[in-house]
């Protein structure tokens, strides 16, 4: 996971994000960085525990939103798609889960999961339920999956899908590697459209 997924318990903050940390020994640096991560986790749970509605039956959010059982039930969420390597299902007896174990790094291949994630979202909707797609912060990995879903299901361009998601969840910001994978998806969809237009 990268520092893009702020607050991630397993992400390592760069020294530059904590002014003056260079003067401490490695053990103290690690302790300070761990404390900063704990504070960020607590802030995420406090401030971001309600998912964002992207479209009918599709929500996007953070780990805190995925833990908020009462809100999820009130939104008719029946399925939860977790896009993170270190997060376990919070309520395995209450929701249908799919976990895609990936880290938020530019070299992570998230594109290989696009089709199965789209199928999972479609299945939840077919059954009359709703699905929450989340990672740790609901900023990069989960956003990438939701953008890919909108592109594949509605024929949106990358720009249209990303703008729509950002209008519903302003923190949305896939890492550069995920943007490249979405650009590849867009190109493959354009080639497919050209092929079938003959």
Swiss-Prot record:
* Catalytic activity annotation: O-phospho-L-tyrosyl-[protein] + H2O = L-tyrosyl-[protein] + phosphate; O-phospho-L-seryl-[protein] + H2O = L-seryl-[protein] + phosphate; O-phospho-L-threonyl-[protein] + H2O = L-threonyl-[protein] + phosphate
Query: In which tissues has expression of this protein been reported?
Result: Expressed in roots, stems, leaves and flowers.
Enzyme Commission number, as recorded = 3.1.3.16, 3.1.3.48
Q: Which GO terms describe its cellular component?
A: cytoplasm; nucleus
Query: Is Hydrolase one of the keywords UniProt gives this record?
Result: yes
Record localization: Nucleus; Cytoplasm
Q: Which GO terms describe its biological process?
A: protein dephosphorylation
- Which region ranges are annotated with the description CaM binding domain 2? 151-180
Q: By what means is the activity of this protein regulated?
A: Inhibited by sodium vanadate and sodium tungstate. NaF and spermifine repress specifically phosphoserine and phosphothreonine phosphatase activity.
S-S bonds: none
Sorted keywords for this record are: Calmodulin-binding, Cytoplasm, Hydrolase, Nucleus, Protein phosphatase
Q: Which PANTHER family match?
A: DUAL SPECIFICITY PROTEIN PHOSPHATASE (PTHR10159), DUAL SPECIFICITY PROTEIN PHOSPHATASE 1 (PTHR10159:SF511)
The entry sums up its family as follows:
Belongs to the protein-tyrosine phosphatase family. Non-receptor class dual specificity subfamily.
Q: How does it assemble?
A: Interacts with calmodulin (CaM) in a calcium Ca(2+)-dependent manner.
Question: What is the name of this protein?
Answer: Dual specificity protein phosphatase 1
Q: Tell me the organism.
A: Arabidopsis thaliana
